[in-house]
Amino acid sequence: MIIVESGPLEEMKAHVVTTFPDECCGFLYGAEQTNGSRMISTILKVNNSKTGDKKRRFEISGKDYMLAEKFALENNILLLGIYHSHPNHPAIPSEHDRVAALPYFSYVILSATPGMIDHIRSWKLNDETQFEEEAFSPTHLNQSI
């Protein structure tokens, strides 16, 4: 299970709003609990460095990955995953998302339409490099932003 504290959750939602209709992205930081769940306490927004159609794809630069690792070390916090938006599409990873995914990370996807976050879901790669959904708290938002 992945649990996102209210502050980081609001930051992610605001990031989606300000970049809509393009995809946005960022890093998820926090702690792993003894029961295996992940508590997200901090996010780090990054620019979508994708050239071309940012409405359907996102890309995080190598430099941003290095800065993300540095941020984790400097703040004594774990880098646990990545979030990104799916404007006008479901919160289900695409094949492009799967190919670009790294093991261990949680991938939180925010499905958005104009002025609304429809769903937030989280995914992790299994041993066969396929996405499996992980429980997310909360799972349905259906609230205006």
Regions found by a protein language model. Name each.
Residues 1-79, 88-145:
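Conserved beta-strand-loop surface patch within small alpha/beta domains used
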Residues 85:
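Residue-level "edge-of-site" marker
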